[in-house]
């Protein structure tokens, strides 16, 4: 079931992204989750992704696949080999919910990930727990040192935004900016983006 659903989701997302681009909306990248089970299908999954991109007319560089830390725990696994071939096609690969699993930093360094996405559980307490704040700061610094962009997941308050800006995070995602939207509402948001107020001036002691 997850294989069929995953393929359907990818096809719908790629087709919608192509429609937005054809309508002259801002160049964008769409993100789809890829499960370990899907990636472990190897060439069959790669062929499916390549076919969907070809049918939709979407440039592979406009697609990003999110994977969990478990996906690259074993060097040389079918899943890791599949990720490498997808990366060679031009697709961006990112680590989702980083900080929740047991990823080896060596493996993180050795794979050309485009970005790491900090787990919601760490972001949730970033303004109230100094230890979480320190871990988030360290992850952002590490990601930048490895030439990756860093995304904060689950951002829900202005205070979290201010803290993450201070740590120089690249992107933020969460209910503070928008709840999940149906396609029509999402299209209107892309056409006329309205972001909530953010205190962007960071005080210097």
Regions found by a protein language model. Name each.
Residues 3, 98, 126-134:
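Cytosolic catalytic cores of cyclic-nucleotide second-messenger enzymes
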Residues 44-45, 78-79, 104, 128-131, ...:
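Residues at alpha-helix caps and immediate loop-helix transition turns in enzyme cores, especially N-
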Residues 165, 181-205:
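C-terminal helical cap(s) of enzyme catalytic domains, especially alpha/beta-barrels
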Residues 50-126, 140-180:
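The catalytic core of metal-dependent phosphodiesterases that act on cyclic dinucleotides
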